[in-house]
Amino acid sequence: MARNGSARSDGPALAVHGGAGRERGGERAARRAGVARAAEAGWGVLAAGGSALDAVIEAVAVLENDPHFNAGFGSVLTEDGRVELDASVMEGTGLRAGAVGAVTSVANPVRLARAVLDEGREVLLVGAPAATLARRHGLQRVAAEALVTPAARRRWERRDEAPGETVGAVARDARGAVAAATSTGGLAGKRRGRVGDSAVIGAGTYADDRVGAGSATGPGEAIIRIGLVRVALDHLAAARSATAAARSALAVLQARLGASAGLVLTDARGRLGVARTTPSMPVAVRRVGAARALLVD
């Protein structure tokens, strides 16, 4: 059964997710506090008149810096004990997008994906060339080992193969532009060089001002094969709400590939939708008139 939270909104709006899956014991409170902080960071951009693109990047960067999420610092490790990160961003006005895959020494891959978008030469960069771009844009670079937390190392030593999660955000700004961003450390124990849906435009991330924006979380290979976010946005035209569109897309994923996942969406008017077919997915939403982020699960 799809589990969901929906939003009625017009004007600026923001939704942030911390990844669909099964939470480990003791993580619930920390993960919900994390998505709430991320939503407040993104909302601060929107409240100051900033762009949807800047808002989703700021929100996701907060989660990349939080070791309770599988993105940036604290990500799961590859089969040989390294961190390799994927991320993507997209803005819906000009359909500009940027993505990076299998990067190893960048603190915030979502900001590196933004650099790819800003340069506009490519949509996706993988590995060492992406690190070169980070140097050119003055982005914070760290030793690869600095991204590994003791908890992640212990899980790797136990060969804990729990599915990797993903973080992401969608937003609409006061000018009516929409954007989405997604970031992940990928699957625990993955082979080096594996790139998942978080770096694939149309699968894990998409934005179009005429329709809306979405960020997905779940099994990357299945999400890529379906093109999950594009499926969800295609359903928006006929759906009664963004949540209904998200549910419909997740039903397609389940029916065709037997996979469970989660989605956050905004339509072109800033009405938010949240749905999941997994045991948990912490989400925080922010809308005009609300004093603080609303947690949805």
What are these regions (language model features)?
Residues M1-D297:
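Alpha/propeptide regions of enzymes that mature by internal proteolysis
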